[in-house]
Regions:
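His/Met- and acidic-residue-enriched segments that coordinate or traffic transition-metal cofactors
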Residues: 1-143
Length: 143
């Protein structure tokens, strides 16, 4: 579960950094900076917790698929510029955060056996849901 949490957050940090260099809209850049900041914080919180618990996150099919999906999305986004990039980036963020919230609700939180990990995932879920709503609002403004 920890490997999935770190991978999911790293994907959004990397995509956000790309958006900071390519986005045209000030609102999209602001959103991208929020993604980099918030998801970097989530990675640190997860890393601190696994250190405290003396566990090593194990890569698995889900974490590997998240990383691959993130790489594929960034490759597609990197080919776009301006308004086309902004729209594609925000569309990607809506889909990505929707998937993350569902994974947290359906798999990660219910299967977390450690109370501290479950608490961290619940906190991350709240942030991911807020990001999803923010991305949806941006999506509406870009149409």
């Amino acid at each position: 579960i920890a490997a999935i949490a770190v991978a999911a957050n790293q994907v959004d940090v990397d995509t956000g950094k790309l958006a900071l260099t390519k986005a045209r809209s000030g609102e999209v850049k602001k959103f991208a900076q929020t993604m980099v900041t918030d998801h970097s914080g989530a990675i640190k919180a997860a890393s601190d917790l696994v250190t405290k618990l003396k566990v090593t996150p194990q890569e698995n099919d889900t974490s590997t698929a998240l990383v691959k999906g993130g790489q594929d999305a960034r490759a597609k986004l990197a080919k776009l510029d301006g308004a086309a990039f902004d729209k594609a980036y925000v569309d990607n963020e809506v889909a990505y955060h929707d998937t993350v919230v569902k994974a947290l609700d359906d798999t990660l939180i219910p299967n977390a056996q450690n109370g501290e990990l479950k608490s961290l995932l619940t906190s991350v879920r709240g942030v991911a849901a807020a990001h999803l709503e923010h991305a949806r609002q941006l999506q509406k403004s870009l149409k």
